[in-house]
Amino acid sequence: MTNRTIIAFDFGTKSIGAAIGQELTGSARALAAFKAQDGSPDWQKIEKLLKEWQPDLVVVGLPLNMDGTEQLVTEQARKFANRLHGRFGVQIALHDERLSTVEARANLFDRGGFRALDKGSVDSASAVVILESWFERQLG
């Protein structure tokens, strides 16, 4: 296994969570979430993040319904991933993110109760769950 640096995004129309991880350890940590306007992030802040961390791969969570069907935000997440690739030339992987927010909320609540459940924290914690789930899938 290589030691690639990987960034994950939990796409949302109002907030986009971010996490960074190392493939060798299979672990991730939350980064600051980005505010978005109708799904459009501040691309300068995204560019700054990518320049700072220089990821080998970017994983974008793909929001699906529980039965695996797509929803409106699924297509928006795909567009976000395509724009990341087009603007910055980064390699992209899409990853099923079903139940990532539920797991992230539970993890945050366990650590800090209701006070820990602000929107940005939940979105970035969801990005951690997405990335760690992606790592697990690569091993399995």
Curated annotation (Swiss-Prot):
GO cellular component, one term: cytosol
Gene Ontology biological-process entries: rRNA 5'-end processing
EC assignment: 3.1.-.-
Enzyme class per UniProt: hydrolase
GO molecular function, one term: nuclease activity
Keyword Protein transport among UniProt keywords: no
Residues spanning the signal sequence: none
Pfam families: RuvX
Keyword annotations of the record: Cytoplasm, Hydrolase, Nuclease, Ribosome biogenesis
Subcellular location: Cytoplasm
Main location: cytoplasm
CDD domains assigned: YqgF
Disulphide-bridged cysteine pairs: none
InterPro entries reported for this sequence: RNaseH-like_sf, YqgF, YqgF/RNaseH-like_dom, YqgF/RNaseH-like_dom_sf
Purpose: Could be a nuclease involved in processing of the 5'-end of pre-16S rRNA.
UniProt similarity note: Belongs to the YqgF nuclease family.
Protein name: Putative pre-16S rRNA nuclease
Species of the source: Serratia proteamaculans (strain 568)
